[in-house]
């Protein structure tokens, strides 16, 4: 019954959330059912909130701006309408944010580390994603995925996650595209310069995967998504490795890069 309630909640996508900076995969195709085993759904009583990434059996990484009251995490889901037998639901036991994060900028140091209330079991549709040992290079082909909008200007959301390939771009591209705001050095600029493929509403918090490695967290981008010359901005996981490892090791006073 619990999973039935979960799926019912996921189908109730409140339009009020569509104005947030959360994003969805536009220009992609249905993901292979086994290629997103680390992809996590964050949801509450209002419905779908964000994506996230399982990094081990007890910890999930998502975007800080995805934080909400009383959310849960769902693992192993592919279709919102058809259950996988190995789907698992967990509550957050603890949530960790960068202590030096700017409170008036929801995408500053846009990373949240979640400790689960109990361990998740690996299964056919559930497995953690490896953290990086180095950042991706410009030109790398990376994978985005999520249940976000498939048409940027309409409230149309898929029943299954969509995936697409995009490229790591020079950081100067995003600085030029978004000259009206600061684009932090601790982010990755990624997309297709001519447009047409991008993360979009409700993809926020999900992974940017390069060569099978967890390299980025969906943070923010242009509106509508997928426009030429307006790539996505992703939190660079590599820059937060020390913070992530310190928190997991029990050092709750760990600080993030400036």
Swiss-Prot record:
SMART domains found in the cross-reference section: Tryp_SPc
Residues modified by glycosylation: 185
Tissue expression: Expressed by the venom gland.
Main location: secreted
Entry annotation: catalytic residues: 65, 110, 204
Signal sequence bounds: 1-18
One GO molecular-function entry: toxin activity
Keywords: Disulfide bond, Fibrinolytic toxin, Glycoprotein, Hemostasis impairing toxin, Hydrolase, Plasminogen activation, Protease, Secreted, Serine protease, Signal, Toxin, Zymogen
Result of altering residue 202 to G: Is inhibited by plasma inhibitors. Is more inhibited by plasma inhibitors
Keyword Cytoplasm: no
Domain Peptidase S1: 25-249
Compartments where located: Secreted
Pfam families in alphabetical order: Trypsin (PF00089)
Positions of disulphide bridges: 31-163, 50-66, 98-256, 142-210, 174-189, 200-225
Positions annotated as propeptide: 19-24
GO process terms (BP): proteolysis
Entry superkingdom: Eukaryota
Root EC class: hydrolase
Stretches assigned to coiled coil: none
GO cellular component: extracellular region; secretory granule
InterPro entries from the UniProt entry: Peptidase_S1_PA, Peptidase_S1_PA_chymotrypsin, Peptidase_S1A, Trypsin_dom, TRYPSIN_HIS
Function: Snake venom serine protease that activates plasminogen.
Self-association state and partner proteins as the record states: Monomer.
Family stated for the protein in its record: Belongs to the peptidase S1 family. Snake venom subfamily.
Descriptive protein name: Venom plasminogen activator TSV-PA
Organism (species): Trimeresurus stejnegeri (Chinese green tree viper)
């Amino acid at each position: 019954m619990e999973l039935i309630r979960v799926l019912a909640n996921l189908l109730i996508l409140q339009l009020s959330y569509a104005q947030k900076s959360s994003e969805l995969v536009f220009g992609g195709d249905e993901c292979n059912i086994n290629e997103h085993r680390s992809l996590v759904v964050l949801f509450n009583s209002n419905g779908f909130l964000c994506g996230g990434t399982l990094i081990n059996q007890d910890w999930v990484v998502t975007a800080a701006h995805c934080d909400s009251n009383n959310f849960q995490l769902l693992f192993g889901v592919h279709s919102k309408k058809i259950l996988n037998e190995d789907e698992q639901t967990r509550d957050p036991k603890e949530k960790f944010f960068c202590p030096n994060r700017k409170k008036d900028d929801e995408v500053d140091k846009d990373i949240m580390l979640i400790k689960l209330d109990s361990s998740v079991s690996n299964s056919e549709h559930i497995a953690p994603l490896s953290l990086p040992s180095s950042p991706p290079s410009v030109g790398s082909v990376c994978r985005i995925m999520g249940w976000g909008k498939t048409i940027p200007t309409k409230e149309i959301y898929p029943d299954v996650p969509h995936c697409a390939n995009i490229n790591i771009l020079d950081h100067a591209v995003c600085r030029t595209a978004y000259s009206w705001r600061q684009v932090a050095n601790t982010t990755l600029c990624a997309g297709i310069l001519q447009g047409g493929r991008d993360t979009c509403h409700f993809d926020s918090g999900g992974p940017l995967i390069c060569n099978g490695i967890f390299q980025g967290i969906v943070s923010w981008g242009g509106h509508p998504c997928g426009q030429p010359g307006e790539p996505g901005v992703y939190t660079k996981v590599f820059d937060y490795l020390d913070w992530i490892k310190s928190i997991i090791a029990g050092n709750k006073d760990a600080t993030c890069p400036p």
